C-alpha cells in the first residue's frame, strides 16, 4: 500500500540527531553585519588590545584598581573615593570650598608623645599639638575650620596599620574614615558647594567609585593585596585618566579588503567554551572483582549562551592526547580487586576542544589567516567513583586535579552523523594541581593527575571564557557561501517558495484521475519510488530522502508515536497497580483517551474538536500498526502526494521535506474510523460521536464509548473511506447486497474500483471529496 512511505519515514526519522538542529540554525539565523573599517582599511589590522574578553570580573579576572596617580591638585569627581597611600608622616591631603570649610588630614607616626609641630596648611604655617599613644598603628587626624582666620580643631582620628586613608565628596558632605583598623567606619563633614571643592593630595592615590565602597573599606582595614591588578603600572598624572581608550568590540565584523568577487572579513568574537569529559568503564568477566579498562573518550556538548545581547548556539567536542596508562593489581585470587588499565592525564598530556557556533564567523571558515585566541585557564577536579564489588567495602577512586592553559588554536572539522562542521580547535596544556588522587582501601595514594573514573566531578560542564580573532576570505556577495558544503537556504526565501508550492499543489487536486489514484494507492510506495518522479539525479534523490527524514522527525505524526508510547507505558503501570474497572478502562483507552474524557467531563477545558482530533490521531496510529488488506486514508494521501510530486514544477531539495511533512499532517483532516465485530459495525465519526449499526440494516444507533475502546484494543481499525452517510445514501438510492456493504465497510480497493468504473456518482463524490481534502 502507498502508506508504506509514512511507515518508512517514521522508522528512519529517529536516526537524525544534530544535523537537523544545525540545518535549522543555519536557515533561521543568517544575519550579517558589516562594520565601517575606518582608518584601518589600508593597514589590515585594528589596534586591538586582546584580553580575556568581556566577562564577569568575579569569575575570570580580578577587579581593576584605578590608579596609582601622582600627587596633584584637582577637583575629584563626586561620589568617588580618593584612596590615599602616604609613605611618610606629615600632611596627607587638604581641600576647601573657600567659603565655610577648610579640611586637611595629617599622619602621625606610632608612639609619639604629646608634642607641638608645625604644618603648612593652605599656604600658612600652623602650630598643632599632636600625639599617638599606639605602639604599632599610624594615626590619621582631620584638621578642620569654618572660617579663613579661624582656629583648627581636630577630628577623627583613624588608627591604621595599613597606612591608607579615604576622602570622598558626596551628597553635600565630605566623607572620611575614622575609628581603628580593622574596624574602621566612615564619617562626614557638612559643606556647601561641595562639588567645587578642590583637593590637594601630597601622596600617591587611587580612585574608587561609591558602588565599590565595600572594596575601599576592605583596603582601608586590611591594606592593598601584595599584587593588585591596577590600571597603571607606575604612578601617572591624573590627566591621563581623561584619555579615551579605543577597544575592539566583543563582536565585530570588519571588512579588511574587498574586490568584485571576494572580500577579507576580520571576525572578532567573545566566546564561552563549555565542555565535558566522557569516559568508558568496562568490567571484566568473572566474579565481579576485576575491571579491564577505565578510559577517556571524546565528548560532544551543545549549549546556548548570550553574547553581546544575542543568543548563540554552540557545539564543542572534547578529546585528550598524551594519556598515561596506570594499573592496579590487588592479587592473583579471583576475589582480588584488579584494574587492568586506567587512564590519567598529567602535565605531559593535552586537551583538545573543538568549538563551533552559529555566528557568521563560522559560516565561511574555509580560507583563514591571522588566527589568534586568548582564553582563561580552568581547573578540572576529579570526583569519587566507587567500584561496586560483590562483597566488602567498595574501593573508591577519588581526587586528582589538573588545570588547563591555552596553548594555541588551529582550524579543525567536527564530524557528526550527517554533516561536518568547520570549527576551531583550541589546544590546552596541562599542569597538575592539588589534591592528588588515590584509590581508597588500596595501596594507591598520593598520585598526581586527573583519572578517567569521574573527571567531571558531578558537574554538567566546565567553562572557559575568552575571545578569538581571524581573517577569512569570503564571497563579496553576502548571499553566496564559500563552496565547501551544501549551501544554506535563507528562511524567508524558503517560505516564499513553500507558499508558491502549496498553491500549485492545491490546484493540482482537480487534475487527478480517480481510477489511476486507486491503482497508485495500492502500490507499495517507498522513499525512492516516491521521489523518483523528481527531475533530478539519483544522488539528489538520495539527498532529498535524507532531508525528508530529518524534517519528518519533528512532524506531529512522529510526535504522536512518542506520545502513544508514553500512554501505553502509563496504562501498563496502571494495570500493575490496580485491577479495578477504572484501571482496565484506562488501559483500553490508550488509543482513544475515552476514560480521560469521561472522568474529566465536568472540568475539561478542551473543545470537542480537540478531543476528536486526538482520538483520530490515536486511531490512525493503531491502523498503521495493524495493516489490513483494505485501503486507508494514508494510502489515498500518499497516492495524491505522489501524483502531485510528479506533476509539480517547483519542487527542490529544500521545499520537498516541508511539503511531505505537511502532507502527512494536513491531508484529509476529517477522518472516521470503524471496528467490525461479527455483523455489527462500531464507528467513531468526525464530529466526536460513537455509534453502531448492523451490516444488514445500516440503521444507526448509539453505543457505549467503553465498548468501542475495548474493541479497538483487540480488533483492527479500518479507515472509513466510505463513511456511514455515504453507505446509507448508496443503499437507499441503489440498493447494495450484504457482501457489497461488507466489502465497502472494509475499504476493499477492488470493490471501490468497480463502483468508480461504473461511474457511480455517490462513490465518485466521496472519493473526490477526499482528494479535495488533500490540501496544504
UniProtKB/Swiss-Prot annotation:
<feature type="disulfide bond">
    <location>
        <begin position="318"/>
        <end position="380"/>
    </location>
</feature>
<keyword id="KW-1173">Viral penetration via permeabilization of host membrane</keyword>
<keyword id="KW-1032">Host cell membrane</keyword>
<feature type="site" description="Binding to sialic acid">
    <location>
        <position position="101"/>
    </location>
</feature>
<keyword id="KW-1160">Virus entry into host cell</keyword>
<keyword id="KW-1038">Host endoplasmic reticulum</keyword>
<dbReference type="GO" id="GO:0039665">
    <property type="term" value="P:permeabilization of host organelle membrane involved in viral entry into host cell"/>
</dbReference>
<feature type="disulfide bond">
    <location>
        <begin position="203"/>
        <end position="216"/>
    </location>
</feature>
<feature type="coiled-coil region">
    <location>
        <begin position="484"/>
        <end position="518"/>
    </location>
</feature>
<keyword id="KW-0348">Hemagglutinin</keyword>
<keyword id="KW-1043">Host membrane</keyword>
<feature type="region of interest" description="Spike body and stalk (antigen domain)">
    <location>
        <begin position="248"/>
        <end position="479"/>
    </location>
</feature>
<dbReference type="InterPro" id="IPR035330">
    <property type="entry name" value="Rota_VP4_MID"/>
</dbReference>
<feature type="site" description="Cleavage; associated with enhancement of infectivity">
    <location>
        <begin position="247"/>
        <end position="248"/>
    </location>
</feature>
<dbReference type="InterPro" id="IPR035329">
    <property type="entry name" value="VP4_helical"/>
</dbReference>
<dbReference type="GO" id="GO:0016020">
    <property type="term" value="C:membrane"/>
</dbReference>
<keyword id="KW-1015">Disulfide bond</keyword>
<keyword id="KW-0167">Capsid protein</keyword>
<dbReference type="GO" id="GO:0044163">
    <property type="term" value="C:host cytoskeleton"/>
</dbReference>
<dbReference type="GO" id="GO:0019062">
    <property type="term" value="P:virion attachment to host cell"/>
</dbReference>
<dbReference type="GO" id="GO:0039624">
    <property type="term" value="C:viral outer capsid"/>
</dbReference>
<keyword id="KW-1152">Outer capsid protein</keyword>
<feature type="site" description="Cleavage">
    <location>
        <begin position="241"/>
        <end position="242"/>
    </location>
</feature>
<keyword id="KW-1035">Host cytoplasm</keyword>
<dbReference type="GO" id="GO:0020002">
    <property type="term" value="C:host cell plasma membrane"/>
</dbReference>
<keyword id="KW-0175">Coiled coil</keyword>
<keyword id="KW-0946">Virion</keyword>
<feature type="region of interest" description="Spike head">
    <location>
        <begin position="65"/>
        <end position="224"/>
    </location>
</feature>
<keyword id="KW-1162">Viral penetration into host cytoplasm</keyword>
<protein>
    <recommendedName>
        <fullName>Outer capsid protein VP4</fullName>
    </recommendedName>
</protein>
<feature type="site" description="Binding to sialic acid">
    <location>
        <position position="190"/>
    </location>
</feature>
<dbReference type="Pfam" id="PF17478">
    <property type="entry name" value="VP4_helical"/>
</dbReference>
<feature type="short sequence motif" description="DGE motif; interaction with ITGA2/ITGB1 heterodimer">
    <location>
        <begin position="308"/>
        <end position="310"/>
    </location>
</feature>
<feature type="region of interest" description="Hydrophobic; possible role in virus entry into host cell">
    <location>
        <begin position="389"/>
        <end position="409"/>
    </location>
</feature>
<feature type="short sequence motif" description="KID motif; interaction with HSPA8">
    <location>
        <begin position="644"/>
        <end position="646"/>
    </location>
</feature>
<keyword id="KW-1161">Viral attachment to host cell</keyword>
<keyword id="KW-1037">Host cytoskeleton</keyword>
<dbReference type="GO" id="GO:0044172">
    <property type="term" value="C:host cell endoplasmic reticulum-Golgi intermediate compartment"/>
</dbReference>
<dbReference type="GO" id="GO:0044168">
    <property type="term" value="C:host cell rough endoplasmic reticulum"/>
</dbReference>
<dbReference type="InterPro" id="IPR013320">
    <property type="entry name" value="ConA-like_dom_sf"/>
</dbReference>
<feature type="site" description="Cleavage">
    <location>
        <begin position="231"/>
        <end position="232"/>
    </location>
</feature>
<dbReference type="InterPro" id="IPR000416">
    <property type="entry name" value="VP4_concanavalin-like"/>
</dbReference>
